[in-house]
Amino acid sequence: MRNLLLVAAVALSTAGCGIIYKQPIYQGNLIKQTAVEQLQVGQSKQQVSALLGTPSIPDPFHAQRWDYTSTQRVDRLARTDVKNFTVFFENEQVVRWEGDYFPAQDEQLAKSAPKQFGRNLARDKKKQRGR
């Protein structure tokens, strides 16, 4: 009986840890609104890659289409927002693009990342220089 109560207490206390806080998770390509505004019909794949980065889904069956996917999970219920942005090519040049992304949140996400996840750089200047 005592062991059963101990097991139940441990199970309940560890199960409650996940309810308190879930860290927001951002994955995929974070496309900036300024980059989308710079897209133009007739640009090459190299120019698009410089603006938006490498596509998240390289599809050999649709070589004339680049898909950029990003996801954001922010609440405790693990609700995930998925955004897809697609660039279409013909003869290696941009024809059109469509989709959605996180345009209003890109600057906010970039600024809040160090607060949420900590700094990635060393604080000691000697370590920053590689010494």
Swiss-Prot record:
Keywords from the UniProt entry: Cell outer membrane, Lipoprotein, Membrane, Palmitate, Signal
Cross-referenced Pfam families: BamE
Location of this chain's protein in the cell: Cell outer membrane
Transmembrane segments: none
Positions of the UniProt region annotated as Disordered: 112-131
Lipidated residue numbers (N-palmitoyl cysteine): 17
Annotated lipid attachment (S-diacylglycerol cysteine): 17
Membrane topology according to the record: Lipid-anchor
GO terms for MF: protein-macromolecule adaptor activity
Gene3D superfamilies: 3.30.1450.10
One Gene Ontology CC term in the entry: Bam protein complex
Cleaved signal peptide residues: 1-16
Gene Ontology BP annotations: Gram-negative-bacterium-type cell outer membrane assembly; protein insertion into membrane
Subunit: Part of the Bam complex.
Family listed: Belongs to the BamE family.
Function of the protein: Part of the outer membrane protein assembly complex, which is involved in assembly and insertion of beta-barrel proteins into the outer membrane.
UniProt name for this protein: Outer membrane protein assembly factor BamE
Species in which this protein is naturally found: Xanthomonas campestris pv. campestris (strain ATCC 33913 / DSM 3586 / NCPPB 528 / LMG 568 / P 25)
Lineage per the UniProt record: Bacteria, Pseudomonadati, Pseudomonadota, Gammaproteobacteria, Lysobacterales
